[in-house]
């Protein structure tokens, strides 16, 4: 079976990210041969962060991507930054027993700090605020998930509130 690759596009998907991005940014296709010390494939969060950190040791860093920076799934998230994982707590504890779980949670927390540190260090023009987040869900499985995580974070001294439907509607300003 042969796979025909899809043509790369420079069109952004319809998203909050696209709607609020600097319209003046447009990156063309790489059409010439280049040499570099470090080539990074992918201009999502991981690729861009790798490039930023690599430039602390070398100036010769090139990033390539089949589309615009941030085009992929990480670029469509609307800008939320919070130390959350979509797996249930017990599943993660099974995957990362003992100290591995604690290290995993610390990595989640450190990742949030890193985002805000980079924004400050490089004076990124954005409206970054550390003001919490709402993680919504519907149904018994989602309620169990949210309850487990809210109890976990509260146990670590975080300010966490489990909201019902009415309180969530009040906080976000809509019932939809």
Feature annotation, model-predicted:
Residues 1-38, 56:
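Extreme N-terminal leader/targeting segments of oxidoreductases
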Residues 12, 25, 29, 76, ...:
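Residue-level signal for pocket-adjacent positions within structured domains
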Residues 33-63:
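N-terminal Rossmann-like FAD-binding beta1-loop-alpha1 element of flavoenzymes
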Residues 67-103:
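Conserved N-terminal glycine-rich FAD pyrophosphate-binding loop of Rossmann-like flavoproteins
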Residues 92-176:
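Rossmann-like flavin
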């Amino acid at each position: 079976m042969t796979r025909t690759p899809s043509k790369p596009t420079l069109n952004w998907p319809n998203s909050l990210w696209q709607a609020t991005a600097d319209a003046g940014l447009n990156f063309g296709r790489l059409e010439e041969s280049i040499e570099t010390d470090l080539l990074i494939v992918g201009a999502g969060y991981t690729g861009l962060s790798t490039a930023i950190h690599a430039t602390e040791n070398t100036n010769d860093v090139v990033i390539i991507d089949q589309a615009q920076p941030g085009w992929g799934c990480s670029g469509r998230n609307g800008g939320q930054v919070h130390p959350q994982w979509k797996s249930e707590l017990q599943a993660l504890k099974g995957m990362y027993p003992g100290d591995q779980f604690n290290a995993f949670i610390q990595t989640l927390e450190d990742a949030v700090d890193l985002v805000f540190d980079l924004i400050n260090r490089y004076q990124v023009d954005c409206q970054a605020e550390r003001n919490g987040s709402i993680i919504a869900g519907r149904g018994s499985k989602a309620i169990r998930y949210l309850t487990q995580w809210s109890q976990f974070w509260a146990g670590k001294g975080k300010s966490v509130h489990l909201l019902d439907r009415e309180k969530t509607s009040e906080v976000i300003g809509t019932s939809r």
